Curated annotation (Swiss-Prot):
Its EC number is 2.4.2.4. The enzymes which catalyze the reversible phosphorolysis of pyrimidine nucleosides are involved in the degradation of these compounds and in their utilization as carbon and energy sources, or in the rescue of pyrimidine bases for nucleotide synthesis. Homodimer. PANTHER family: THYMIDINE PHOSPHORYLASE. It comes from Burkholderia mallei (strain ATCC 23344). GO terms for biological process: pyrimidine nucleobase metabolic process; thymidine metabolic process. Pathway: Pyrimidine metabolism; dTMP biosynthesis via salvage pathway; dTMP from thymine: step 1/2. Keywords: Glycosyltransferase, Transferase. One of its GO terms (cellular component) is cytosol. This is Thymidine phosphorylase. Pfam families: Glycos_trans_3N (PF02885), Glycos_transf_3 (PF00591), PYNP_C (PF07831). Belongs to the thymidine/pyrimidine-nucleoside phosphorylase family. The keyword Cell cycle does not apply.
Amino acid sequence: MTFLPQEFIRKVRDRAPLDTADVARFVQGVTAGDVTEGQIAAFAMAVYFNELPLSARIALTLAQRDSGDVLDWRGARLNGPVVDKHSTGGVGDLTSLVIGPMVAACGGYVPMISGRGLGHTGGTLDKLEAIPGYDVAPSVDMLRRVVRDAGLAIVGQTAQLAPADKRIYAVRDVTATVESISLITASILSKKLAAGVGALAMDVKVGSGAFMPSAEQSAELARSIVDVGNGAGMRTAATLTDMNQALAPCAGNAIEVRCAIDFLTGAARPARLEAVSFALAAQMLTMGGLAADAHDARRRLRAVLESGAAAERFARMVAALGGPADLVERPERHLPRAAAAAPVAAARAGWIERIDARALGLAVVGLGGGRAKIGDTLDYSVGLSALAELGERVEAGQPLATVHARDADSAAQATDAVRRAYRIGAEPPAQTRVVHAVIE
């Protein structure tokens, strides 16, 4: 029988039972170009309003995985598991830059397919492109070599990996259907499965700087990713983490790379960044069979940080992908620096009781360090550093942050935006945990 995309879309629209074979045929049509952009848009909107049952989410994920190349690491003679992490994105979230090297130093192999920032969230690829010469789009053969030799490679999605997802996402982005939990789930997991990942630690953000607008929706997304990932044959766990303030005390591409280097070398390890990084990396080690339990995993992770093995893995990856061989030893020589810097003075004395993390991210976008739309050119040097945290006591005139900008005018605009993102009160706020819950 001839497959008609419009009949399949009608079933999704009407919440009729879906044949998993029809899901696969629809995705095959997307890849081949037989399904039009209008039909993709209609499908995405139908899913947005109705969502998909678990069986159809799994089928959609597997079909998107199979729309292109699927990396098979069995012939690469790796002596450890292939594991990965993924975050729904936030502000000051540089965990990928430290978790990948830590896990690689513990014996894991991490082919991390990452994305660019859009809106208020920072993108891992944008951070890495602040490193001169770093190639975020190597060939599949180069990706294999770097993962085998360095233990990790943090790169972008190639044209050969999950091409159907790329086409569907492009339509979602312009049809107000990005927020569909079913489509988010399939998009994330199809790329991870195409990369040949055996176990995935998922970081789902909650709070003012999170991608999902509510804690309930964040939890729903985490549950969906865990159920679909495991249903598709990839061991998956999700951690709900706090994004009511920047995760690290900085935001901006080159600034975050420097923060990651400081973390790996021990120059500075901010507590919130350390808590989330250790939680996710420990999950990767235990799911991959590299540690007996969370306590054993944390002991191993601490050891590779203190010995310098994790920093060495990061340096090896950077050099293998075209970056400076001495980046870890001399970051100030290679990373771009903004021309202007300005402190953000607190308007009054008191306790920091609320931070609008989304506003901080948008301040970086306003400086030129993020994208208002796809295709925007970035200034990798700009951003924020020394961000004050929730619950801190500040005096009037005390710096809440430092703005790094291309000129004095843009620094002044960002200074006002950052100051407005902080609410200072008379009483200290209730303390909140950075790791809210784990879903397995």
